[in-house]
Amino acid sequence: MNQLIVATGNAHKVEEFDGLLETSGFEVCSAKVCGGMPYVLEDGDTFGANARIKALALRALAPKDAWIVSDDSGLEVDALGGAPGIHSARYAGEGASDLHNLNKLLLELEEQPASQRAARFRCVLCLIDPSGREQFFDGACEGRIAKAPEGAAGFGYDPVFVPEGHSESFAELGESIKSKLSHRALAILAMRRCLES
């Protein structure tokens, strides 16, 4: 069975990959099999570039016959020219909390009507096979930014992101619905289709 190592220290992310790649012929492992995820400076200017940086950093430590996958993701708001984008986790500055990032976003959109609040969560995966070939897979969940936070579940921008076709935020919809709409899940499923073809 092929080994697929997920370049992250986040156990929940590894579980998401494992669940969606079940029966794919890949054994999904965390970066722990390589001694842990090394520190990397994510200084790329796109989600794909940052995903590639992480994948290459782990590949240097991984067994030569392993497949490596990494992701980078964030929120893109059309009225803000795609921001916060690759800066989603630190939108209000280095070390900013989720609440600070969310409040900065709402402040910047304060004057925007509902029709101008289109947004999406985007995820880009970088997959490196044992030969070193790189492939990228994109997943996006379209929606809009609400005027105020709603719901207590989730994290980050979940309380203000209302996915297309729904009237409740990700934080109100709950994990089971969110996981079906997830930008990461869509990217993983695109990768799985490629691996199985």
Predicted regions and their residues:
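Anionic-ligand binding patches
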Residues: N2-I5, A11-S197
